[in-house]
Amino acid sequence: MVGKIAPVAVDAMGGDHAPGAIVQGAINAARKGLPILLVGPEARLRDELARHRAGHALPIEVHHAGEVVEMDDHPGQAMRRKRDNSIRVCFELVKSGRASAMVSAGNSGAVMAGAIFVLGRPEGVERPAIISVLPALKGSSILLDMGAVVDCKPIHLVQFALMGEVYARRVVGVARPKVAILANGEEESKGTDLTRAAAAALRHAPLQFVGYCEGRDLLTGEVDVIVTDGFTGNVALKTMEGTAKVVGEYLKRALRSTAVSAIGGMLSKAALDGMKKRLDWREVGGAPLVGVNGVGFISHGRSDAIAIENAIHRARDAARAHFVDEIARAVAPSEALLEGAAGRAARPPPPRRASSHDA
């Protein structure tokens, strides 16, 4: 039984398959007891609910928003000029407390802009980040940033690590998350000026920092929080999505190639279906924002009803974890950590002790 908490606001007009697939996903979640605020043009959404034969007993309420942010709209301008757009209205519902979280498969830049404009950032947060929860061999790992900040400074990576550790602990449920920076090797000498500066600071942070990890470690589960800039993170995620799709296709072709393989394929179908489900991006549903004063999830633009339903469940779980309350405290030491690292780097090395061999 779901504990009493404010509904999840769902942007019914965001995504390639809106509003039909979005409404269906919301209905599926509502049928499992999750209260929903469906946001968009009221008349159109009521028609959609009727088309999907959603009964009046379901915990779904329609909240009118008269404008829509298109995929080619400039995010900042859309938030300022289309003040009644469904993304912004979702965030206003979160800010007012009428919604516990929001989900949108719409323009991701507009979702980020709306979060900053409407919710604002916790004290001390330089830039928000987007998290991806990865299906690892051991549980789950989280990767951030996924594209919110492509040109990072050391303080951004430090804060991503601190915020990601909070999310892994409070939402994912990892008691003591291992945190690493994504680099081209595990040695301290690897990486760039950016990663080395952030790593030097994080070695003295109040978390379990394990240094660098490599791309091969993304899905092993050996590291719980993997930190990188938004450009690298986005490329890494898209590469994993593409690889999973190609590997799945290879397996299907191989199992269909001969009669013996076909029999083997039938015998292994359950295992393959389990693997496919584990790697299916729709199972994750959406990518949470961290570093704003509220819970927001960005779903893939091509999300179907399955993805939206899962995003709603995950948004609900994140809201119940109250992780946002801890973010300001987590990032508070970030400036001091960087200053301390810079001070240590500037110190001259200790003088070499004389030995009998020097004589």
UniProtKB/Swiss-Prot annotation:
Main location, first listed in the record: cytoplasm
Catalysed reaction, written as an equation: a fatty acyl-[ACP] + phosphate = an acyl phosphate + holo-[ACP]
Segments for region (Disordered): 338-359
GO molecular function: phosphate:acyl-[acyl carrier protein] acyltransferase activity
Stored Gene3D superfamilies: Isopropylmalate Dehydrogenase (3.40.718.10)
Annotated GO CC locations: cytoplasm
Keyword Lipid biosynthesis: yes
Pfam families per record: FA_synthesis
Pathway(s) the chain acts in: Lipid metabolism; phospholipid metabolism
Alphabetized UniProt keyword annotations: Cytoplasm, Lipid biosynthesis, Lipid metabolism, Phospholipid biosynthesis, Phospholipid metabolism, Transferase
EC number: 2.3.1.274
Biological processes per GO annotation: fatty acid biosynthetic process; phospholipid biosynthetic process
InterPro entries assigned: FA_synthesis, Phospholipid_synth_PlsX-like
Localization annotation: Cytoplasm
Role, per record: Catalyzes the reversible formation of acyl-phosphate (acyl-PO(4)) from acyl-[acyl-carrier-protein] (acyl-ACP). This enzyme utilizes acyl-ACP as fatty acyl donor, but not acyl-CoA.
Subunit: Homodimer. Probably interacts with PlsY.
Family (UniProt): Belongs to the PlsX family.
Name of this protein: Phosphate acyltransferase
